[in-house]
Amino acid sequence: MAAFDTIDDLPADSRVLVRLDLNSPIEDGKPQDNRRFERHAETVRELADAGHRVVLMAHQGRPGRDDFTSLSGHADILADHVGRDVAFVADTFGDEALDAIDALGAGEVLLLENTRMCDDELPEADPEEKAETEFVQTLAPQFDAYVNDAYSAAHRKHASLVGFPLVLPAYAGRVMETEYEANTAIATREFDGPVTMVVGGTKATDVIGVMDALDDRVDRFLLGGVAGELFLRAAGHPVGHDLEGTDLFDEQWEENRELIESVLDERGDAIRLATDLAYEGPDGDRAEVAVDDIDEKTDGYLDVGSETIAAYEPPIHESDAVFVKGALGVFEDERFADGTVGVLEAIAETDCFSVVGGGDTSRAIEMYGLDEDDFSHVSIAGGAYIRALTGEPLPAVEVLEAAAGRQ
């Protein structure tokens, strides 16, 4: 069991500051509904139904990226899931936010603006330093308690995650509670047969380090997505495409090149790379090319190819456990969902312990009608889930544990 207090311990009639993780895919400037809203709505609804005055914090994207937007649209989606109004204020801790907080009645819910629009939020720092920021020092006196429900961001040392538990009684929400217990159990479980990890997605930096750290737990890695392209480049293939209109791929390559080459050198026999990739052909249909036939860097490889999918299925079927972090392609486009869906279907039909992690991958399960019950656990966490596999500490969990019993 976790060593932190939960919302079961929250005093009645509290004004609570609740940290969620509503970070979502953005299409045409609008957030897309996903399981994070559904899961966090359970915590918000429970708090509001109990008569607490509920003020929510969350983030979306990072400054400078296309998905860095206001949370105004998130409030509408969350309200649909909670089943009651969720007011929104385009401010984090200024006068407008403080006035809206002060006016909040019992059972009412308010969402503050994107925490990453606050200068105090993003730079990673120790909790003691974050607790002294103007952001925390201004907001904290307005509340009786702090609730962290953002397990998927628990590996970050951001002000909204690690600062408030040092100055307020702190509790875990339902998502934090259930994800922590599930992922802790995963990290300590032993398996009799082969353990396979499917690695994809666009955020490769955290995963590459974990691949190195999981050397003694994972027997084979099946790669796709950006991580797969990074390893293909290390193997001498001219691949790698721009992400979200930026040079994020090249940034991840430069940041991780030495580690990638080291992992490939030491664990090359355990790492399966794509042998073909899919892209949009001249007629707009899905087209595929063998990796060995790629002779120059081309933007736009959007999925692993059919040969790769077929090659990934047997090791999955032979596994005692399969962990998934990230999608193998741009599954939001049906033309490039084959890799992600094919691997998930192979896992679902295998009698093994299986965990699917990451908000995008769990969204694929919903989009393509897969049965969540066919997997041992479906986590909305990405980076935190990966770190839990290695037993690495999660800063936001550590401060909750340190705050236990403080009321």
Curated annotation (Swiss-Prot):
Membrane-spanning parts: none
EC number in record: 2.7.2.3
Keywords: ATP-binding, Cytoplasm, Glycolysis, Kinase, Nucleotide-binding, Transferase
Major subcellular location class: cytoplasm
InterPro entries: Phosphoglycerate_kinase, Phosphoglycerate_kinase_CS, Phosphoglycerate_kinase_N, Phosphoglycerate_kinase_sf
Pathway: Carbohydrate degradation; glycolysis; pyruvate from D-glyceraldehyde 3-phosphate: step 2/5
Coiled-coil portions: none
A Gene Ontology term for the protein's cellular component: cytosol
Keyword Nucleotide-binding set for record: yes
Classification via Pfam families: PGK
Any one biological process term the GO annotation gives: glycolytic process
List of residues binding substrate: D21, L22, N23, R36, H59, Q60, G61, R62, R116, R156
Domain of life, per lineage: Archaea
Molecular function (Gene Ontology), one example: phosphoglycerate kinase activity
Catalytic activity, as annotated: (2R)-3-phosphoglycerate + ATP = (2R)-3-phospho-glyceroyl phosphate + ADP
Subcellular localization, as worded in the UniProt entry: Cytoplasm
Binding site for ATP: E332, G358, G359, D360, T361
Subunit composition and interactions: Monomer.
Homology family: Belongs to the phosphoglycerate kinase family.
The protein's name in its UniProt record: Phosphoglycerate kinase
Gene it is expressed from: pgk
